[in-house]
Design a protein with these regions (language model features):
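Conserved glycine-rich cofactor-binding loop
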Residues: 9, 16-17
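Conserved glycine-rich Rossmann-like NAD(P)H-binding loop of the short-chain dehydrogenase/reductase
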Residues: 30-47
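Conserved NAD(P)H cofactor-binding loop of Rossmann-fold oxidoreductase domains
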Residues: 92-97
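Substrate-binding pocket helix/loop in short-chain dehydrogenase/reductase
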Residues: 100-113
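Active-site helix of classical SDR
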Residues: 124, 160
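Residue(s) in the substrate-gating loop at a strand-loop-helix junction
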Residues: 144
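SDR active-site lid
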Residues: 166, 172-236, 245, 249
Length: 263
């Protein structure tokens, strides 16, 4: 099913920068009202004011830490109390860590799993009935090309994104013919603040795409008559992901380890 933008409402997590902010801009340009969620209230307000003035859409800002239990129901109830129903959900919030597992901080690992996996599932479950009732929008979960193979040096991050890909493709099948477009977006290295958290651009492999290119890939997929369950952004990334799925597992792990050995 193709997307409806004008007059609908899109909820975007991790909206204060990077892919989240780009999704917000491109949806607003198409006439979507927005709910922007992230921890940084000042960044959200700045973005919201810009989008309101440029596109004349309604933008609701909800500063919130998503990395805790029950956040899906909390977010849903907060919007219901404001009379806001959601047509499109974009689960973009997440972060990655970089380095051998034995050197990782256990609390950071727990936070990474909570935000990248638990919060995404919780928010999806909370809003899915409303998304299905609307039938005019989409569920977009941001995965990664890291989902296609284990990555020594990014073991936890890669595993969380493999979960997101598997989970989203399953939900896409469960909801087929419902009118809801369900998509796992798998970008490769992208020019965002993600790498500030990860440990610098030395962790990136190959030429980075821009946020605009990645979001453009998602919108193109959502515009298809039959939206695929997942899409990889960038032809080099598509080729690499394809090889990762066809080569022996031990080979893909060794290649991935070499690709991130700069740390």
């Amino acid at each position: 099913m193709t997307m409806t933008y004008a007059g609908t409402t899109a909820l975007i997590t991790g909206a204060s920068s990077g892919l989240g902010a780009e999704f917000a801009g491109q949806f607003a340009a198409r006439g979507s009202n927005l709910v922007l969620v992230a921890r940084r209230a000042d960044r959200l307000e700045e973005l919201a004011q810009d989008l309101r003035s440029r596109h004349g859409v309604t933008v609701t800002v909800l500063p919130m830490d998503l990395g805790r239990a029950g956040v899906g129901r909390e977010l849903f109830d907060s919007l219901a109390g404001r009379g806001i129903t959601v047509d499109t959900l974009i689960n973009n919030a997440g972060f990655g860590t970089h380095g051998p597992l034995v050197e990782e901080d256990p609390d950071t690992i727990a936070s990474e799993i909570s935000l990248n996996v638990a919060a995404l599932v919780d928010i999806t479950r909370a809003f899915l009935p409303e998304l299905l009732a609307s039938g005019k929008g989409a569920l977009v979960n941001v995965a990664s090309t890291a989902a296609f193979q284990p990555i020594p040096g990014m073991a936890v991050y890669g595993a969380t994104k493999a979960f997101v890909l598997s989970f989203t493709e399953a939900v896409a099948h469960e909801t087929k013919n419902s009118g809801l477009n369900v998509l796992a977006l798998c970008p490769g290295a992208t020019r965002t603040e993600f790498f500030d958290v990860l440990g610098g651009e030395s962790a990136a492999v190959g030429k980075m795409q821009t946020s605009q290119q990645v979001v453009g890939t998602a919108l193109k997929a959502l515009g298809r008559k039959d939206t695929p369950g997942s899409v990889v952004s960038g032809w080099v990334n598509r080729v690499t992901a394809g090889f990762a799925q066809r080569l022996p597992r031990a080979v893909t792990v060794a290649i991935a380890a070499r690709a991130v050995q700069d740390w």
